[in-house]
Curated annotation (Swiss-Prot):
One of its GO terms (biological process) is response to oxidative stress. Keywords: Cell inner membrane, Cell membrane, Membrane, Transmembrane, Transmembrane helix. May play a role in reduction of the SoxR iron-sulfur cluster. May work together with the RsxABCDGE complex. This is Protein RseC. One of its GO terms (cellular component) is oxidoreductase complex. The gene is rseC. The chain crosses the membrane at residues 73-95, 99-121. It is found in: Cell inner membrane. Pfam families: RseC_MucC. It comes from Escherichia coli (strain K12).
Length: 159
């Protein structure tokens, strides 16, 4: 299970709208000062993803929840998104090269195959998105932001 913390934006009728920050690098290792990934992360836009997750328990905006998604579904979707355009590119380029015996035809076939593979991946991803095992789930819920209070006694404050 791949896990990530998210912040609740709203909750209505058993559906929680949560926001996840995009992290391209962790910024936690000792070599972060010379890390190329960290530098690239600072250059890009700081974006968030907002998704709807089913949740029977009422949630408060600002509350933290831990989301989880199965590794198998993530690997399958990555395989679909990356491999189908690549396979389409090679297959149609090879077919056009055999049929027309021209590099220009092979180039056109590669472009058409890549676009076709992308469209196939997009169509299948919409079908797979409806499956329950491809949906993120809420694994744990943190306390609401205003529930925890720290008080110090006057004796501790004077010392």
């Amino acid at each position: 299970m791949i896990k990530e913390w998210a912040t609740v934006v709203s909750w209505q009728n058993g559906q929680a709208l949560v926001s996840c920050d995009v992290k391209a690098s962790c910024s936690s290792c000792a070599s972060r000062a010379g890390c190329g990934s960290r530098v690239l992360n600072k250059l890009g836009p700081q974006t968030t993803h907002t998704i709807v997750v089913p949740c029977d328990e009422p949630l408060v905006p600002g509350q933290k929840v831990e989301l989880g998604i199965a590794e198998g579904s993530l690997l399958s979707s990555a395989l679909l998104v990356y491999m189908s355009p690549l396979v389409g590119l090679f297959l149609i380029a090879s077919l056009f090269q055999l049929l027309f015996a021209s590099d220009v035809a092979a180039l056109c076939g590669a472009i058409l195959g890549g676009i076709g593979g992308f469209l196939i991946a997009r169509g299948y991803s919409r079908k797979f998105a409806a499956r329950a095992e491809w949906q993120p789930i809420i694994l744990s819920v943190a306390l609401p932001p205003g529930l925890v209070r720290f008080e110090t006694s006057s004796e501790d404050a004077s010392q």
